[in-house]
Regions:
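Active-site/ligand-binding surface loops and adjacent short beta/alpha elements
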Residues: 157-228
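Extracellular/lumen-exposed scaffold segments
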Residues: 37-87, 182-204
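Beta-strand-rich recognition/accessory modules
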Residues: 219-298
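Residue-level recognition of well-ordered beta-strand positions that form the cores
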Residues: 27, 115-117, 130-132, 148-152, ...
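Extended, loop-rich substrate-binding clefts of extracytoplasmic carbohydrate-active enzymes
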Residues: 66-141
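Acidic (Asp/Glu-rich), glycine- and aromatic
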Residues: 35-38, 42-45, 138-184, 277
């Protein structure tokens, strides 16, 4: 009798409404949303070891003007002068899902691969983006979200303008924020909170704080050494958000036929790990190569 195939413990499971549920033994730890009503794909929730999400949608005290804060998302404020960061305005673009490429399930990781079009306000495509979202299981119910990105200019050179806004951002749960929950921001350079970390380069930035009355959890945003501006300048705020800036120091041009590839990680963890532990996790991540996107249609 043939041996039954093993059921992967980590699975990326398609859901109604253009969503993918990342599950460990059938229990969701994250969900990728790629419907076009939001103007950009995003990941929400990111479930920590306690069973609660360490991220949220929107600013807890200013939800109207920060409605574009979608938990974990990819965006940029200046793409050939078009604003892909905010949702409202005269020159606002949209990141529109085009297609899904293969799913991947295994014992300790699951992934989904998609194609997005970055369209200006007239619908003109500026960039084609290929994205791979991976959830990698770690000991003690912790896990790592890996975001691989490949940007290609569609027909003419595209300039990502100088700005601290973009491309990788995380909005933390209200109780984890420094202002609202008494949380703490730390970086790889030994600095703490907005005053010391804001607009400073680092390998990683961690945001930890209360998630229940008895538990502390958080997330660490990793910049990969293969990224062209590593170590990235981080834009952080005590109100609960952190982002890795790609073009803080100057613009970057993507020429046709010469795609830009990026890799980031978000480590979802229990407690407030020591800096040495976070550095060890970052070093493990730094040794992993960026995902190799195969030519489309092959």
């Amino acid at each position: 009798m043939a041996q039954p195939k093993l059921v992967p413990r980590m699975q990326a499971v398609p859901q109604p409404g253009q969503q993918v549920s990342f599950q460990r033994d059938g229990i969701e730890i994250a969900r990728y949303h790629f419907g076009n009503e939001s103007g950009r794909p995003f990941v929400f929730p990111l479930i920590g070891p306690s069973g609660r999400s360490v991220t949220r949608i929107g600013h807890p005290n200013d939800p109207q003007s920060h409605s574009h804060h979608y938990s974990v998302w990819v965006a940029h404020r200046d793409v050939n002068g078009v604003n892909f960061w905010e949702e409202r305005g005269k020159n606002v673009g949209r990141i529109v899902h085009q297609s899904i490429e293969p799913f991947f399930d295994s014992a300790d990781a699951a992934a989904v691969q998609t194609v997005n079009a970055w369209l200006d306000h007239t619908g003109k495509p500026l960039l084609t983006e290929r994205r791979r979202i991976t959830a990698q299981w770690l000991p003690n119910r912790e896990w790592l979200l890996i975001v691989d990105l490949q940007f290609s200019a569609t027909s003419e050179p595209v300039t990502l303008g100088k700005t601290p806004f973009g491309v990788m951002a995380v909005r933390m749960a209200k109780t984890i924020g420094v202002h609202d929950g008494g949380g703490t921001i730390r970086n790889s350079e030994g600095a703490a909170n907005d005053k010391e970390i804001f607009w400073k380069p680092a390998k990683w930035v961690d945001y930890s704080g209360p998630i229940t009355a008895a538990a502390t959890e958080g997330a660490t945003l990793f910049d990969h050494p293969a990224n062209p501006n590593h170590p990235a300048v981080f834009h952080v705020r005590d109100d609960g958000w952190m982002g890795a800036s790609l073009t803080f120091d100057g613009s970057r041009v993507i020429a046709p036929g010469k795609p830009l590839q990026l890799r980031y990680g978000v480590y979802v963890h229990a407690d407030q790990p020591a800096r040495e532990q976070l550095q060890e996790r970052w070093e493990e991540f730094s040794r992993t190569p960026p995902f190799e996107f195969k030519p489309r249609g092959k």
